[in-house]
């Protein structure tokens, strides 16, 4: 779609940061209320509190229908491990089914089982909350023009661990790997046709872009301020270090700490998903739409194979610690994140690397 105490201290949201400066197009216009409807079942009621219709993009939000990170779950002050998926969605050519159209004062409900994406086998009291931002389009349109913030109530639940453990994990499946390529541990047996060559090229390009970005993070304070919202220490060396870690992981000389699949074997390649990561397993899966992207985009902030791979590698705790989340997609949303969130946002790294490569 999921952590360490540092992320908990930062109050990392599931989708986009709640501490974004208010503007006419991004103030709070929806209310989210969480309610327990079973041992580990949650019902989220999303209400449009404004006076105009909202067209809400579901990707990586409380309304996402896939096993993504919708809420933060805490037990005894620590985050409960997230076992779901962190996808990168294709943000161009959006279609109406990716949106929820919500009229003024209207509500929509979305239910999900926490035990399908979290390890709740310990049982006991947990605290659940959600906050973030939803990209918005005009009514009956699919072009993103703004965003709206939300923050839910804090919900306390007493979970039966045995019942929770009996819930099937949404992203469970066979962990067998087959033939492994040294570079980022590519499972070559998962590749068909030219896919292995395409992925190897993407990893090579991701390494090259990451090394250039690492250098720029140290030497180009204006770009750091543009994307990471600060050029102060410790952000510059931290950003550079993370880029170098991605570069090492994606280079041909790496022994590989992640396992990379050319194709999906866990059912996570839903419509709109380019690739996804299971951070609890340090596994990355490409989807069919990944292979429709250009190897490298010649458009500033455009999506491509190299930066999608870079994006996904930042989701893996074996590469980046604490690993990055999906707190903001696209240049406008990334630009709205404060420094504490930008450093933890996967798309910040892919957009920065793209900007350095193209001289944006």
Swiss-Prot record:
User: Which key words are in the record?
Assistant: Cleavage on pair of basic residues, Disulfide bond, Glycoprotein, Hydrolase, Metal-binding, Metalloprotease, Protease, Secreted, Signal, Virulence, Zinc, Zymogen
Which BP terms in the Gene Ontology apply to this protein?
Answer: proteolysis
Which Gene3D superfamilies did the record assign? 2.60.40.2970, Collagenase (Catalytic Domain)
Question: Which residues are the active-site ones?
Answer: 312
Q: Signal peptide: which range, if any?
A: 1-17
Names of required cofactors:
Zn(2+)
Catalytic activity reads: Preferential cleavage of bonds with hydrophobic residues in P1'. Also 3-Asn-|-Gln-4 and 8-Gly-|-Ser-9 bonds in insulin B chain
Q: What is its EC number?
A: 3.4.24.39
Proregion residues are 18-183
Amino acids binding Zn(2+) = 311, 315, 326
Disulfide-bonded cysteine pairs: these are 191-262, 269-287, 300-360
Subcellular location, principal: secreted
Molecular function in Gene Ontology = metal ion binding; metalloendopeptidase activity
Give a short account of what the protein does: Probable secreted metalloprotease that shows high activities on basic nuclear substrates such as histone and protamine. May be involved in virulence.
**Protein name according to UniProt:** Probable neutral protease 2 homolog A
Q: Which gene encodes it?
A: NpII-A
């Amino acid at each position: 779609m999921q952590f360490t105490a540092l992320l908990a201290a930062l109050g990392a949201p599931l989708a986009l940061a709640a501490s974004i400066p208010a503007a006419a197009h991004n103030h709070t216009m929806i209310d989210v209320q969480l309610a327990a409807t079973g041992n580990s079942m949650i019902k989220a009621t999303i209400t449009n509190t404004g006076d105009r219709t909202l067209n809400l993009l579901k990707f990586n939000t409380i309304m996402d229908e896939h096993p993504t990170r919708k809420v933060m779950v805490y037990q005894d002050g620590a985050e409960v491990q997230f076992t779901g998926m962190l996808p990168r969605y294709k943000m161009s050519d959006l279609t109406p089914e990716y949106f929820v159209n919500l009229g003024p004062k209207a509500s929509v409900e979305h239910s999900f089982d926490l035990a399908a994406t979290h390890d709740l086998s310990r049982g006991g009291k947990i605290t659940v909350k959600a906050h973030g931002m939803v990209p918005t389009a005009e009514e009956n349109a699919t072009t993103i023009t703004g965003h709206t913030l939300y923050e839910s109530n804090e919900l306390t639940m007493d979970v039966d661990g045995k019942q929770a453990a009996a819930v099937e994990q949404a992203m469970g499946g066979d962990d067998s790997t087959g033939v492994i390529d040294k570079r980022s541990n590519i499972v070559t047996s998962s590749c068909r046709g030219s896919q292995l060559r395409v992925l190897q090229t993407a990893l090579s390009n991701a390494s090259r872009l990451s090394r250039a970005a690492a250098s720029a993070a140290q030497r180009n304070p204006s770009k750091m301020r543009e994307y990471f919202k600060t050029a102060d220490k410790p952000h510059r060396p931290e950003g550079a270090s993370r880029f170098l870690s991605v570069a090492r992981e994606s280079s041909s000389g790496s022994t590989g700490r992640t396992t990379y699949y050319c194709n999906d074997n866990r059912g996570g390649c839903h419509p709109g998903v380019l690739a996804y990561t299971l951070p609890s397993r340090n596994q990355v899966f490409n989807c069919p739409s990944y292979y429709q992207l250009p190897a490298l985009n010649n458009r500033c902030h455009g999506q491509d194979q190299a930066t999608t791979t870079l994006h996904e590698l930042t989701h893996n705790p074996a590469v980046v610690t604490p690993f990055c989340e999906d707190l903001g997609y696209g240049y406008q949303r990334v630009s709205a994140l404060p420094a504490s969130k930008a450093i933890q946002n996967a798309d910040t790294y892919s957009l920065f690397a793209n900007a350095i490569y193209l001289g944006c």
